Amino acid sequence: VSRHSDTDIRIIPPRVKGGLVLFGAHDWGALLQQAKKNNISRARVCTHMDNRSAVQEMLIAFMKDSYVRPHRHLGKSESFCVIEGELSVIFFDENGKETDRVALSASDSKKPFYFRGERENWHTVLIESEYAFIHETTTGPYEYDDRLLAPWA
């Protein structure tokens, strides 16, 4: 286990011949258990080879009480595909006032299950179900300073 950032635990997934990364129900169960035990109520598996990869892909388990401090990414796009559960992506202005909210769901056909944004808006994720499991993709390489934490949060 190694750290992806100062707040998330990174669990290295099994890799198989040919550079394939496989992740199944057993892995999902283990990741969910890790999120339940983690003091920040989330855990991730990074499926990219390293922080220099041009595409950064992660499978993330969030518990309902997980707090994601509002932040923004400099010069990066970001997308979420909800695999299980429900969440909202909440956007804020420079003063911390909510400006938009996008509800995502893996099971409610009236809500989208996918979100992609290229704006450098302040945002956070609010878990609406007992837990949520997402596939997140962002542009690399990963640089810790590319993510700015909101000073008002």
Model segments located where?
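Double-stranded beta-helix
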Residues: 99-103, 108-110, 122-153
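A short, N-terminal "cap"/entry segment at the start of jelly-roll beta-barrel domains
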Residues: 1-55, 100-107
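Glycine- and acidic-residue-biased ligand/ion/polar-headgroup-sensing regions
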Residues: 64, 75-95
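Conserved hydrophobic/aromatic beta-strand scaffold that supports enzyme active sites
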Residues: 59-61, 79, 114-116, 136
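Short strand-connecting beta-turns/loops that link adjacent beta-strands
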Residues: 52-53, 75, 130
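Conserved short histidine dyad/triad with adjacent acidic residue
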Residues: 59-76, 119
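Short beta-strand His + acidic residue motifs that chelate non-heme Fe in jelly-roll/DSBH
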Residues: 69-71, 89-91, 115-117, 123-128, ...
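Cyclic nucleotide-binding regulatory domains
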Residues: 87-115
